Amino acid sequence: MAVNPELAPFTLSRGIPSFDDQALSTIIQLQDCIQQAIQQLNYSTAEFLAELLYAECSILDKSSVYWSDAVYLYALSLFLNKSYHTAFQISKEFKEYHLGIAYIFGRCALQLSQGVNEAILTLLSIINVFSSNSSNTRINMVLNSNLVHIPDLATLNCLLGNLYMKLDHSKEGAFYHSEALAINPYLWESYEAICKMRATVDLKRVFFDIAGKKSNSHNNNAASSFPSTSLSHFEPRSQPSLYSKTNKNGNNNINNNVNTLFQSSNSPPSTSASSFSSIQHFSRSQQQQANTSIRTCQNKNTQTPKNPAINSKTSSALPNNISMNLVSPSSKQPTISSLAKVYNRNKLLTTPPSKLLNNDRNHQNNNNNNNNNNNNNNNNNNNNNNNNIINKTTFKTPRNLYSSTGRLTTSKKNPRSLIISNSILTSDYSITLPEIMYNFALILRSSSQYNSFKAIRLFESQIPSHIKDTMPWCLVQLGKLHFEIINYDMSLKYFNRLKDLQPARVKDMEIFSTLLWHLHDKVKSSNLANGLMDTMPNKPETWCCIGNLLSLQKDHDAAIKAFEKATQLDPNFAYAYTLQGHEHSSNDSSDSAKTCYRKALACDPQHYNAYYGLGTSAMKLGQYEEALLYFEKARSINPVNVVLICCCGGSLEKLGYKEKALQYYELACHLQPTSSLSKYKMGQLLYSMTRYNVALQTFEELVKLVPDDATAHYLLGQTYRIVGRKKDAIKELTVAMNLDPKGNQVIIDELQKCHMQE
């Protein structure tokens, strides 16, 4: 065996200045043991052995291959053991010597929100090497060393996209995530990031053109991509990386004269503050390879690059097989007529929402018609003013507005014991991976754009039943989608199915808890909160569930403390800030509520529920113009939400624009004909405009939707009296009196008016 001059003065066994084959063999054996421990998830063992390897190789020259490999394995072990700060410090010093070290440094920077600029510079330098088809010897050595967890080009681009998003550079983040998808169409987190930025991708190209090519390439290289593993000499699986395709002149021989990773033109730029502008520039080779552009509309939610040069460079820097379109929500806000067309195309639900929304958060079940009555505020109304019973009933539902996630009705079977027939095997199981991923991507895009009807239709028509019924992601999405359109019964069934599949699940439980809050189900809410407190006491979702339970018990101060605990555990948890703001609003603390809503928007600019909260706070203060701006901003993010549309109409009504407000209410009724809120608001406005015949028709439809609501019957009876239908008026007012005995005085006054009529 040839002696490596780098190890000549080094002996592992005794530490004396001599070198033999045994020393090199021990180094390799340590590397294999570390990687085997990592593969077996024995991270403590990996960290201990990596410390030994790091210490023993510390006397080598810092340009040594064995030294850089030792640093990488040590940093990787620390990172996997969640010692992020130590891994960050170790990898920071040597990030320019090794691809893997630079990758770990970037991961730590993302995790800790430290050194993000420096990490971007380093990763850009590495990607530039690959983009220029460089035959850099050190990189080829890393790629051919079979080291565990060496990233491929798609992963590097995904990490770069996440780092740019950490800096609120949406345009650059979208570019690198699109690059990642162009290389690996199944890198789901990149597509999730793109949807979160409300960008669009040509999904057919991604999942059929690119995926087809990758599938053929994978079949041709399967044997070489996955070498056999031996316990005696551990050989981790090599990543099926595209680097081997990029580096066509790759050299498998180790060149002992190569001492640095980046040489001459490949050396990384300086990491000083003045050099950060280089982050804004893409490599020349990337621009030459790209033909597709990112188009960004100017808006407050989309961050624009600080360096103007990035605009022109990014515009021509997208891969050929992907099309991106970063769009401002406000720039795509449809008109009233166009929204109606969208609804007609996407109308699907067989079980439409039928919840009457109110501040008292009440929920009652009717066994005859399955409609829910949430309007019991009039129970405490003893005023003689005829308008009090109307003004007492409000329909604001802050918690069903969220930005950020069941048993099915047709089956009571345990999903683990599903029996699959031959017909299902031939139909449902015949779907290909690109097809199922394409459909999932369509669903995620529709969901991120709040097109809930379309997403539900895609689930029903495109996703095989065995996947839809047993995959937690599908159950979560369906639960969220039905929750978003206020179809609480269906949402509850999907979340119940999810809890059956994963009883210890904590992710997305804050949405389930809010659903139970709307249904006024204290028992299930208590069981959920207590169960999570026993198993996951340090999760922010747990404290959101506790906060919702306390809010349900009318203990708003304790609920605020619970939501504060959630934000302490996760300072970027936008939904927790919003829920905290709702509690402050319930305590009439408008300033504190606004502060919480603004914190939520700082975490997530697309969190439309926070804009809704700001709007309701402004309405309470009589600032109707400001409220309208906030509601319109929320509607620009979620243009088909009937609650937001009604809020816009309410603001316009307060400002005296009744005709315009009526258009909003009509739009809400058209988008969701079963929305009791929109029917109530439109009927009340028509009544105030003395359009009694149209108002009468609207109130009749409202009574059909909520037959157990006293206010609906009262309004209908009052309108009957005005149009001269005395007998019908007495009938409806009598029903209202029976449903709401505490509101008798107001109803009695109206009955007296009926009897005074001829």
UniProtKB/Swiss-Prot annotation:
<dbReference type="Pfam" id="PF00515">
    <property type="entry name" value="TPR_1"/>
</dbReference>
<keyword id="KW-0597">Phosphoprotein</keyword>
<dbReference type="GO" id="GO:0051301">
    <property type="term" value="P:cell division"/>
</dbReference>
<dbReference type="GO" id="GO:0007346">
    <property type="term" value="P:regulation of mitotic cell cycle"/>
</dbReference>
<feature type="repeat" description="TPR 1">
    <location>
        <begin position="154"/>
        <end position="187"/>
    </location>
</feature>
<feature type="repeat" description="TPR 6">
    <location>
        <begin position="642"/>
        <end position="675"/>
    </location>
</feature>
<feature type="region of interest" description="Disordered">
    <location>
        <begin position="350"/>
        <end position="392"/>
    </location>
</feature>
<keyword id="KW-0131">Cell cycle</keyword>
<dbReference type="GO" id="GO:0031145">
    <property type="term" value="P:anaphase-promoting complex-dependent catabolic process"/>
</dbReference>
<keyword id="KW-0833">Ubl conjugation pathway</keyword>
<feature type="repeat" description="TPR 2">
    <location>
        <begin position="472"/>
        <end position="505"/>
    </location>
</feature>
<keyword id="KW-0498">Mitosis</keyword>
<dbReference type="GO" id="GO:0051445">
    <property type="term" value="P:regulation of meiotic cell cycle"/>
</dbReference>
<keyword id="KW-0802">TPR repeat</keyword>
<dbReference type="GO" id="GO:0007091">
    <property type="term" value="P:metaphase/anaphase transition of mitotic cell cycle"/>
</dbReference>
<keyword id="KW-0539">Nucleus</keyword>
<keyword id="KW-0963">Cytoplasm</keyword>
<dbReference type="GO" id="GO:0016567">
    <property type="term" value="P:protein ubiquitination"/>
</dbReference>
<dbReference type="Pfam" id="PF12895">
    <property type="entry name" value="ANAPC3"/>
</dbReference>
<feature type="compositionally biased region" description="Low complexity">
    <location>
        <begin position="247"/>
        <end position="289"/>
    </location>
</feature>
<feature type="compositionally biased region" description="Polar residues">
    <location>
        <begin position="290"/>
        <end position="333"/>
    </location>
</feature>
<feature type="compositionally biased region" description="Polar residues">
    <location>
        <begin position="226"/>
        <end position="246"/>
    </location>
</feature>
<feature type="repeat" description="TPR 5">
    <location>
        <begin position="608"/>
        <end position="641"/>
    </location>
</feature>
<dbReference type="Pfam" id="PF13181">
    <property type="entry name" value="TPR_8"/>
</dbReference>
<feature type="region of interest" description="Disordered">
    <location>
        <begin position="218"/>
        <end position="333"/>
    </location>
</feature>
<dbReference type="Pfam" id="PF13432">
    <property type="entry name" value="TPR_16"/>
</dbReference>
<feature type="repeat" description="TPR 7">
    <location>
        <begin position="676"/>
        <end position="709"/>
    </location>
</feature>
<comment type="subunit">
    <text>The APC/C is composed of at least 13 subunits that stay tightly associated throughout the cell cycle: APC1, APC2, APC4, APC5, APC9, APC11, CDC16, CDC23, CDC26, CDC27, DOC1, MND2 and SWM1.</text>
</comment>
<dbReference type="InterPro" id="IPR019734">
    <property type="entry name" value="TPR_rpt"/>
</dbReference>
<dbReference type="InterPro" id="IPR011990">
    <property type="entry name" value="TPR-like_helical_dom_sf"/>
</dbReference>
<comment type="similarity">
    <text>Belongs to the APC3/CDC27 family.</text>
</comment>
<dbReference type="GO" id="GO:0034399">
    <property type="term" value="C:nuclear periphery"/>
</dbReference>
<comment type="function">
    <text>Component of the anaphase promoting complex/cyclosome (APC/C), a cell cycle-regulated E3 ubiquitin-protein ligase complex that controls progression through mitosis and the G1 phase of the cell cycle. The APC/C is thought to confer substrate specificity and, in the presence of ubiquitin-conjugating E2 enzymes, it catalyzes the formation of protein-ubiquitin conjugates that are subsequently degraded by the 26S proteasome.</text>
</comment>
<protein>
    <recommendedName>
        <fullName>Anaphase-promoting complex subunit CDC27</fullName>
    </recommendedName>
</protein>
<feature type="repeat" description="TPR 3">
    <location>
        <begin position="540"/>
        <end position="573"/>
    </location>
</feature>
<dbReference type="GO" id="GO:0005737">
    <property type="term" value="C:cytoplasm"/>
</dbReference>
<feature type="repeat" description="TPR 8">
    <location>
        <begin position="710"/>
        <end position="743"/>
    </location>
</feature>
<keyword id="KW-0132">Cell division</keyword>
<keyword id="KW-0677">Repeat</keyword>
<comment type="pathway">
    <text>Protein modification; protein ubiquitination.</text>
</comment>
<dbReference type="GO" id="GO:0005680">
    <property type="term" value="C:anaphase-promoting complex"/>
</dbReference>
<feature type="compositionally biased region" description="Low complexity">
    <location>
        <begin position="365"/>
        <end position="391"/>
    </location>
</feature>
